[in-house]
Amino acid sequence: MVKVYYNTVQPDLYNQSLHLFSIIGFLLLSLVWWRSRRSILIAWGSLVAWFLVLWLISEHTFEGLVDWARRSVAIGSAYAEVQSLSLGQPILLVMYVVFAIATVILLVRRHRACSSTRTVRIVSSLLVLFMLYAGLKTGFVREGNAHAFEAFALLIPALIWLAAPIRVTVRRLALLALPAVVGISILVGERPAVGSFSSLYNWPEKASVWIDDANLLTSTVVFERKADAARGAAQAFYGLNDDMVRWLRESPAQVDPFDASLIWAYGLPWRPMPIFQTYMNFTPFLDGVTTTALADRHVDDTILIDTSWVGNLDYRLSLWTSPRYQLALTCSWTPIHRDGRWEQWAKNPSGDRCGSPQSIGTENVSANQIVTIPASGPDSFIVATFTRSSAVPTVLAGAINLLYKPLDPFTIRLGEQEMREPPTFDGSRLIVSCPSGLPVTRRYEAVCPSPLTISFSESGTVTFERIPTRSS
């Protein structure tokens, strides 16, 4: 069901529904073809084949797969460093661990009973272990009930696959138990109160929601009515005035940092960045892709910025979410219209307003040492570059970070605000102070009170640079 959810408009329970249909489809295959292992192999083979076809259609080469995999790992590691949350419902993790232990036991039993070649057994074992690992990282890195449901969705096929060599009775019991497991996962997964199973007692309401969803999928009238209601609710939430809507209809826009559903709500022309949710740029590579796209945008393109996110955005400072992109936006773009929390930016007619960075000091700092940021003055920005010491983490900490989530993520404290920053951005220029003569804009509110102090949760070297600017 389409609805307003927090600060965006999205299909309700989209992830859960997607995985539910995937599991149901797999169950049907398994019931028709009792040798579940074959259906799993068919599913994985189809997935790999389609991936390769799409990869080649997109004019990529096989050699590029290695680079793609390397960058994917870097992005995933940075995501875990920045976005990891404390576990809201430990029982979900306990359930997952129990399932994982059962999976490993089944894997061992299967190898003892199976007459397959060693290569087949090794490949199948690696595949099962990968599914366990992917489920753990997906479900419990950035812990949320929907994410935890994804973990079970990844684990359940492994259990079915491994149940294949066991007696038919046990296999049938495993298959019959799956709908109950899926149902519990869905009930637990729909945003219950933290630390409780309160949603388990709301099944009549959930049944009503599922009936509404079925009507939405099968009735054009219901779909249009729900879509109109969602569009109206979204417009009420975003609150753009008529003038801003008119200006945006004249110029294709990118919405920063993430609210692309605004484009749908108002029917606006959209020209997104390659990573259209710019706060998701977790590595210098993604930052560079977005920065290049910003420089290549048409002269009539605009950027619509939601300045209500100047502070904490998923534990990060909005101005630091993509350092090169944010600095390029600061130097080459300018605000042209304002409407409450929204600012429309366009390319600066006179080009880049920033001069070359000038170093004004370097200091070796210990963990959590407070440093005063130099004053910016009326016509210059101050940027800070921090490089962490090459301290080698303990084996235990490294293993935990790889398998689960960082126990002590890297943080930067700016004044009274504590923010996270991906380790991949070591050496990136972060805006820490803005010119006192800056045009009126809320985008820099977090760094404009001067002088601020800054500290880092690890030891390293901090360098401050002054970037001179002109008013136009």
What are these language model-derived features?
Residues 34, 254-255:
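Small/polar loops that bind or transfer phosphate-bearing groups
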